Amino acid sequence: MFEALIYDSDEQGWLRFTGASSIHVAKTSDDVAVVLDTIEAACSEGKYAVGYVSFEAASAFDSALVHHPAGSLPLAAFAIFDHAEEASPGGMEPGSEPLELAPVIGESSFGDSIQQIKSYLRSGDSYQVNFTHRLKGKTAASPGSIFSFLCRAQPSPYSAFIETDDYAICSVSPELFFEVNGASIR
């Protein structure tokens, strides 16, 4: 199973994707380009591709880029769909189950990372850094309920919910990482 609910900021509405015709997963850096070529071909045929490329896939694009181990999630995963349905996230009502999250990174490692980032900025190795870290927690809430809660707490033009048999991704990003439109990448 690979289903998705995506906010279309151009149309100001939600699109639901179910019944994937195929699913493409990259578990190694070498697999990432193959997956991206496959979805590009499908999109050129008028199909929809929904998925993600993780930050941990960086070395697939430039071997000089350092990344943390990917863990159990694929480096990239996309599903191909023949159509999308207009939808709303209304079917996913927030539950009353508590969600307590704690950072996986320790305070000392966090401080060391911030100092390293400042060093990169001062030396000109980077002009911008998006420092992220994982949070871990337990809840009885469904992934859909968590996504609904996040959408209400932080409305975003780039919200996406992906649910598979093995994991769910709830994203309420305020920014677009990249977009491909014909021969243009922005």
Where are these regions (language model features)?
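Extended alpha-helical targeting/anchoring segments
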Residues: 1-186
